[in-house]
């Protein structure tokens, strides 16, 4: 799936991804597929999978586009 980062708090290490016609999806820094510091920028395009977490759907295998 593809979406845009709605917001991401670098200090806390989480945020949300928005998709057209769907609810926002929680994203944790541990789901970001990159080397080094794992963070996302507001408005950044990403691809991801959705898994079922403890508190509902969350992003997995997040890659910056």
From Swiss-Prot:
Lineage: Bacteria, Bacillati, Bacillota, Bacilli, Bacillales
Protein name (database record): Cold shock-like protein CspB
Superkingdom: Bacteria
SUPFAM superfamilies xrefs: Nucleic acid-binding proteins (SSF50249)
Compartment(s): Cytoplasm
Major location category of this protein: cytoplasm
Organism, scientific name: Bacillus cereus
Domain CSD: 3-62
Gene Ontology MF annotations: DNA binding
Subunit: Homodimer.
Gene3D superfamilies tied to this protein: 6.20.370.130, Nucleic acid-binding proteins
Alphabetically ordered keywords of this record: Activator, Cytoplasm, DNA-binding, Transcription, Transcription regulation
GO cellular component, one term: cytoplasm
Keyword Zinc: no
């Amino acid at each position: 799936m593809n979406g845009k980062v709605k917001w991401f708090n670098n200090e806390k290490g989480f945020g949300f991804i928005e998709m057209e016609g769907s609810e926002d999806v929680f994203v944790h820094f541990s789901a970001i597929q990159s080397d080094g510091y794992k963070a996302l920028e507001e408005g950044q395009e990403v691809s991801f999978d959705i898994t079922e977490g403890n508190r509902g759907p969350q992003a997995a295998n997040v890659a910056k586009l």
